[in-house]
Amino acid sequence: MRKVKKLFTLLTALYMSLMLPVQVMAAVELNTKYEVDTNKIQGWPQAADIASDTGILMDADTGTVLFDKGGDQQRYPASITKIMTLLVAVENSSMDEQVTFTETGVRNVTADSSNINSKIGEVMTMQDCLHALIIQSANDAAAQIAEHVGGTEQNFIDMMNQRAAQIGCTNTHFTNSSGLPDENHYSSAKDMALIFREGLKNEAFRSVIGDADYTIKPTNMTSDKRVFHTHHIMFRNTNRFYDQGYIH
């Protein structure tokens, strides 16, 4: 658990700084420059600026914000939307549930969409789908998880927004489970950090987030196994600047 929390501290800074500005989607001023807000706190260690417009670093145990640059500004969260999809899914399902792919999921199997080439009628476990969601960023898995858990995709999206409000998010609204572009789909660095921190309280969430590799065995529709590997440098430990304890 401690290693996962250490990893969270690093990944939060990365994920939240990678959020794309909503200004490309909605009526928000372009090229807004934000200062490092935590540098304004008297006696607080002064941090260097980051290249990203916004970013946040949060302590997973206490929720203390250690670094904040435009953390409350709305941004298009792209695929880190799937962090909330994962949280709502693990809170409302079990890993061994059988998920049958329908048109809802398979319609996302396109050349310009990250997917696992699922097929209508194909059956996988929820555990398979969640690993495809996180390691492969599979949009077909995201949509199918949503329908399976929520009954309909829209019901699941409503669950995502309700859960975000419960966690304390104030600059977040989801319109889909995968992070596909929509002018009404947005979050902030702080809100996503709150969501991630909430997820760490759940053992199944931690298990999925902590896996760098996963294999889906042959299914009723596919004879080949699907092997997933994360290429994230913090997991792969190939860079001398990362401490091993943080990326185990």
Name what the model sees in each region.
Residues 2-25:
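Sec-dependent N-terminal signal peptides of Gram-positive bacterial secreted proteins and lipoproteins
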Residues 26-190, 194-203:
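Active-site-adjacent loops and short helices of periplasmic peptidoglycan-processing enzymes
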Residues 169-170, 181-186, 190-248:
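Domain-terminus/edge residues, biased toward the C-terminal soluble/receptor-binding domains
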Residues 21, 48, 77, 177, ...:
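Proline-rich low-complexity regions
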Residues 1-4, 69, 73, 224:
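Intrinsically disordered, low-complexity sequence elements enriched in Ser/Thr/Gly/Pro
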